[in-house]
Amino acid sequence: MKLDSAEEKSGVGCSLPAEGSPPALEPAFSKILNRLSRPKSSGQGGARNAALKDLGALIEAAEGDRFFEGSGSGGSLRGMPEILGQVVRALEKFAAPEEKADGVEEHPEVPEKATEVGSLFLKLLGKVEAAKSSPDCPAWKTGLRHMSGPVYIFAITHRLKQPWTSPASQHVAGEVLSLLLRVTECSSVAGFLCGENEDDRGRFAVVLGLLKPHLNKETWKKNPAVKHVFSWTLQQVTQPWLNQHLEKILPPSLLISDDYQTENKILGVQCLHHIVVTVPAADLLQYNRAQVLYHALFNHLYMPEHHLIQAVLLCLLDLFPVLEKALHWKGDTARVTTHCHEVLQLILTHMEPEHRLLLRRTYARHLPAFVKRLGILTVRHLKRLEQVILGYLEVYDEPEDETRLKILETLKLVMQYTWPRIPCRVVVLLKALLKLICDISRDTIPTTEAAKSTMLQEATDCLILLDHCSQGQVKGLLAKIAVSCEDSTVVSCIRKVQQGSADSPGDDTEGD
């Protein structure tokens, strides 16, 4: 502790402007770096706080035009840019949240640390901005290159609302990011990461290099912010910059998605989805990567979590074209839709007994997309689809009845693509649609008027299409009902079906 006291007394003195030459600045920053880098378990909290104050005074006292210069010789004198980079990394680590052993999400000490560190970063970036206008200080570019990565990670860690942030720390982090973009002459975060022009290679590789030690199986949970920084950063990078980093971004994304916590699974799947839609198919197919992605995503479909299912199905729908390309290239055109068949079969298996409304809604929301992708091959699943459609039309989904609207959309698509198989199902489908119209007309379902109106229109369209698929059978069956029915809404729908024109979606598909 005596040594700490001596350092605290002498830490600022060696950096006074009167001695502001680079050889004097380097040892002063090295001492502060040593104090910041001590293990947290050694009870040096007070010394660390004192080191932050000393660092702030040192930055303010140093001369701007000499701040980034250094000899880079003399053994331990590595040059100011490199030392500044190490100091900035130590500061970023100091302000980072840590995993709580008891599972508590709150990090009450982190926002204050982040606010202090953020103000130091603002001072450092201010020095860079001042040095840019000085023709006698070209070394600022080297200094900024060492600093920009850790400063960016700090800003992204603390700028959004998280368990380890406060309004004050979020504000400071936002200011740090804005100043960093201004100093690096970047118009956006994407420009900062990928480069603003052909000569600027960007800093995405640098950021990935800094995150890599914290994104392996043993370390990725020690800092709860790392996964968010990685995910957010990844999604700022688009084609054609992402594919060259595929080997670095795919393993962490798979690792995060394979976690037992649903939140992490969703985050990982979102990363995988961005990779699927951004990286060219040829790169995804190399080394069987696309197949690895498919199996990782397929396994998530067994988890009854609607947010996860939503993310997985969206990703799979974008992955199918990539997998189909591989089979086309192999000449196996008969099996190009194998993966889509597998997923739809599993979805229908889960949909039949499912009683949770959120999951039912999520499954139904994506059912039309699967029917569109399979087209006429949907006929393989027609029996299962019929059972799901009939069952789901009986249960309302307040307040907008999204589930039944999507089921009606699915039914229309099924009839369009598989119209030769529909006549034998006319009576069953007609009963289900009429029951739905009666329920809506009697106001027995607590949904909005707009939803009721839309459902009546969709159900009527389904009846018209069903009539065309059955070559007029529906009109004949409805004729007697129209005479005896006293419900004006039902009669109106029947009249629309009877007056249906020859043009219908069914006519467009008969030539397929």
UniProtKB/Swiss-Prot annotation:
One of its GO terms (cellular component) is TTT Hsp90 cochaperone complex. It comes from the Eukaryota. Pfam families: Tti2. Residues 1-23 are annotated as: Disordered. Residues 1-10 have a biased composition (Basic and acidic residues). Regulator of the DNA damage response (DDR). Part of the TTT complex that is required to stabilize protein levels of the phosphatidylinositol 3-kinase-related protein kinase (PIKK) family proteins. The TTT complex is involved in the cellular resistance to DNA damage stresses, like ionizing radiation (IR), ultraviolet (UV) and mitomycin C (MMC). Together with the TTT complex and HSP90 may participate in the proper folding of newly synthesized PIKKs. Belongs to the TTI2 family. Component of the TTT complex composed of TELO2, TTI1 and TTI2. Interacts with TELO2 and TTI1. Interacts with WAC; WAC positively regulates MTOR activity by promoting the assembly of the TTT complex and the RUVBL complex composed of RUVBL1 and RUVBL2 into the TTT-RUVBL complex which leads to the dimerization of the mTORC1 complex and its subsequent activation. This is TELO2-interacting protein 2. It comes from Mus musculus. The gene is Tti2.
